[in-house]
Every structure is written in C-alpha cells, then in structure tokens.
C-alpha cells in the first residue's frame, strides 16, 4: 500500500475553505490541525486556480521573507541561524547561504529543532526553522512547531507580496527562478503486521549492505548513514556525521542534485521515502516545463528504488 502522506490530508481538509475562498475572492487559505501545531495553505496560481502549497514550499517562502526583512533592516549581525530537518528541501539552505545565515540540519521532530535553539541560547540568534511535514517556527519563544504564529507570518508574507504587486504563488515562482527548481515527493510504503515489520527491517538492511551506485540515471555521490553516523563519498572515503545520536535513516545524494531519504516510521507500520529532485527554471512562465521535467526525474527515481 502506498500513500503520499500529509499533503493528501490537507487537500481534503482544505476543500471546504477553498470553496468559500472562491466565493469571496480570497487571496489565501490556511488551516491547522486540531492541536494547532501544523498549518497547510492554498493560494491561486497564475490561472486563478486554487493550488495546495506543500510544507517545503511554505518553509521556503516564509524563511525567504524573514531573511529578506532581516537583510533590509540591517538585522544580520553575525551568529544568526536557521534549522531544518534532514528530510526537508535543500533549497532553503541555498536561501540561507546566500544571506550568510547558518543552516543547521537535525532529525525529524521539532524537539530536535528546539534542542539546537537551546544549545545556542545566549550565543547565537535563532531566526526560523521548519520541516516538510507542515511544521514551522519563527523566533524562539514557543520551542515547538506552532500553527498560530505560522499563520500570522504566512499572512504577513502574502500581504508583503501583494504590496509588491505579486501573489503568494508568484513569489514562490520568483524563488524558484532565483534559487533553482526543486520538487519533493514522499512515498509511504505500508507493511502491516509482524511480517511487515520484518520486511521493513530487511529493506533497510539491504539498502545498507547493497547501496545503489546510481538512482534515476544519476550516479550516487554521497551516502549518509545516521545509524552508523558515517558519511561515505563516491571514492569510498568515510567521515563521521556530527549528530547527537544515531537514527535508522539513510540518505543518498546524486550527481544531479537528487536527494533520497529512507527511514522506517516510528509510529506506523511503514517505510518512508523522501524524494527531492532539482532542476532549473529560467523564468516564472517556465514552471510547467520545469515541473514536468522534475516529475520525470521523480518517476525515474521511484523506478530505480522499486517503489
């Protein structure tokens, strides 16, 4: 059994709000889960059709906005940092790098982002962070993913974009043009029961014992094994990963910029594959072609991995 994950859930839950937004000609729809820690958003594309913005895209836009404002206001003094989980898009690291902001990687789960904030408290300034699963946090006063402050900030981003003659969707396209195109896709392979748990264990063992040499037609250039805390390059050189503890996660990076993260779920009988492929987008109107090319890459990756 395969499913796409949280994106499908938010698509269903946002449908009533989107229908109302169409009636009142709204610019933005936001929805949180019952405990108000995650937030999903939708906005109109260039054709006026409502589209769901995924967690990676939301994180990109809100961090892009925060860093832009920090830079314009002269608030970047040195020592500022952001945090993302290891399965979140690498594109936000490019945004941070261009603005001379340190971007830290941590394990999935906001306790790890909160840990990085605590470790640097009084020495560095946390600006923002997030994860692909629709969790975001700006500033450091909550120490957990928080849909309330995230909704306020997303609304501010949308208002800022509108003041500059753009929609939220057009802002997203501008980010892709400036930093490169990225498409993310999560596959959840469900393996129920005791036999399923054994099968998932065997899959992870096989990935470690027989790492792929190429994925989707591109050579694997780097492997990160968070269970052994080892980083292996294409020449077989091994170095240590700087992480607080081990975790049953594997990551493969290819020459063309593709990133694949594999990990068993800690709460459900499934193994998760996080796929991120890269491309170029020369202009905002090039989105359709860039997305189509990225979709081909995603399918090639899935075929290589047999998922």
Where are the language model's segments positioned?
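Short, well-structured alpha-helical segments in soluble
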Residues: 14-24
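Single conserved hydrophobic/aromatic residue that forms the stacking wall/gate
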Residues: 1-10
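Phosphate-binding and adjacent anionic-ligand microenvironments
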Residues: 22, 26-28, 32, 49-51, ...
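Short Gly/Thr/Asp-enriched flexible loops that form oxyanion-binding sites at enzyme active sites
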Residues: 37-55, 92
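Well-ordered alpha-helical segments embedded in enzymatic catalytic cores
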Residues: 12-16, 62, 112
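Catalytic or ion-translocation cores adjacent to nucleophile or general acid/base/metal-coordination motifs
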Residues: 53-67
């Amino acid at each position: 059994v395969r499913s796409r994950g949280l994106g499908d859930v938010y698509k269903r839950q946002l449908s009533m709000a989107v229908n109302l937004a169409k009636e009142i000609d709204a610019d933005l729809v936001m929805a949180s889960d019952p405990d108000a820690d995650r937030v999903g958003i939708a906005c109109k594309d260039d054709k006026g059709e409502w589209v769901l913005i995924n967690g990676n895209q939301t994180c990109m836009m809100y961090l892009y906005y925060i860093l832009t404002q920090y830079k314009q206001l002269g608030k970047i003094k040195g020592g500022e940092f952001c945090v993302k989980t290891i399965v979140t898009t690498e594109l936000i690291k490019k945004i941070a790098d261009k603005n001379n902001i340190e971007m830290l990687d941590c394990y999935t789960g906001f306790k790890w982002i909160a840990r990085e904030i605590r470790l640097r408290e009084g020495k560095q300034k946390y600006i923002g962070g997030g994860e692909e699963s629709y969790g975001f946090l700006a500033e450091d006063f909550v120490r957990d993913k928080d849909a309330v402050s995230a909704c306020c900030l997303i609304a501010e981003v949308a208002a800022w974009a509108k003041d500059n003659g753009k929609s939220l969707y057009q802002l997203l396209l501008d980010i892709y043009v400036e930093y490169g195109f990225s498409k993310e896709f999560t596959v959840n392979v469900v393996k129920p029961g005791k036999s399923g748990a054994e099968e998932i264990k065997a899959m992870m063992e096989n990935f470690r014992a027989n790492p792929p040499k190429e994925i989707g037609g591109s050579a694997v250039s780097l492997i990160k094994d968070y269970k052994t805390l080892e980083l292996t390059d294409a020449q077989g050189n091994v170095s240590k990963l700087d992480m607080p503890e081990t975790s049953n996660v594997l990551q493969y990076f290819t020459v063309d910029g593709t990133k694949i993260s594999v990990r068993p779920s800690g709460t459900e009988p499934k193994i998760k594959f996080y796929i991120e492929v890269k491309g170029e987008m020369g202009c905002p109107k090039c989105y359709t072609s860039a997305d189509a090319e990225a979709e081909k890459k995603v399918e090639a990756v899935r075929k290589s991995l047999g998922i």
